[in-house]
């Protein structure tokens, strides 16, 4: 366990250095602030254009639903890309995977550590987006001290699920040459459509709703909204998932554990096949 913790810390430090060394710290912090604010402006503009085009009155509850869902979706793109692009970057760009892989560490833990910096940056962006929404657009949040422990637990479970999905994709990327960026955009895009990020599942056809309810992140988005938005806001929107937070939490716990175990299996399988085929450190000049 001590070796895993040591590997995680060093990999997290390395990931942070690689993410932030392209500029001065002050400029990096400024960039980290401006990016989520700009994304929030784009979302708000889309919201106003949509309601203006349909001639419908603006709905503050739906705006809060959309805004909070989009804010927490920042974790999805950042965490997934930060997890499964490690193999591609170390093998193709920096060509250091041979040295790292043959060192006496757990490569699985190393990738989790490398993703930690992406999680931290994404967390900062989520906080900035929510604060900006409250200050600029009158977003109403209701964070009860009694809900904080459950919120921390839900956030942790969601990140475990995201990192596990990323590690499943990392196991696949052992055997692929140039599909990292396609996966980085395609997989989060699927979650964006099917997990009720911008609209409730009830807005989708029945068969598509079945796809959404099979994805753990759907329940994660539902719980994060339920824990930080006013109860009246959530009651005014039919999400199709019910209002039993403990039941939804139980589903999230089981599915996160299942994806964690699945990630170990797929990662080890991809690693085994890549070693057998001699593709661990094989360059594709891409």
Language model features by range: what are they?
Residues 1-286:
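Hydrophobic transmembrane alpha-helices and immediately adjacent juxtamembrane helices
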